[in-house]
Amino acid sequence: AIHELGHAVVGMVCKHHSKMTKVVINLSAPRSPAYTIFENPPNNFLTRENLFEHLMVLLSGRIAEETFYDISVTTGAINDFEEALKLAEKMVCYYGMGKNVIYPSLSDKYKEIIDLEVSTLIHEAYQQAEFVIHNFKELIVEGSEILKQEKVLTSETLMEVINNKYRHLYENMSNIKFCK
């Protein structure tokens, strides 16, 4: 539940990311015992901000685990990491959304630059998501308790909790530009 609330809360704070619709927990499902559903993007033209914030959301489940569990992280975030790496590589290599314009080449120098750009992008997204998670620790705990009890947590329910207890923090956080 904590892992999924990490995704949900970071997704709700990010103004360029598709909005979260619900979080579901179903421990009897063998492949995916919990998942967070987001709306589809409104169009096919995604900006660097959209994709950067998606990186943040992908990494936030793992960050929530690290923050709340007194153990090392689990293997539950492997799919999120694979997807984050693929997305960061696409952002740099195909979409030209890295810090530098990279021209295709087979040289080792070119590969080094790509690795550095991808690593930097993931590191920056990780730091930004970690900032959000640490600021919303109480909300994540509260939301995970609702999810464990109800098995489904809708965006409306989470927003109700935010409005009742965390409105000022949410409004301040929603004004931050995460993608630099």
Q: What is each residue range found by the language model?
A:
Residues A1-K180:
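Soluble catalytic regions of large protease machineries
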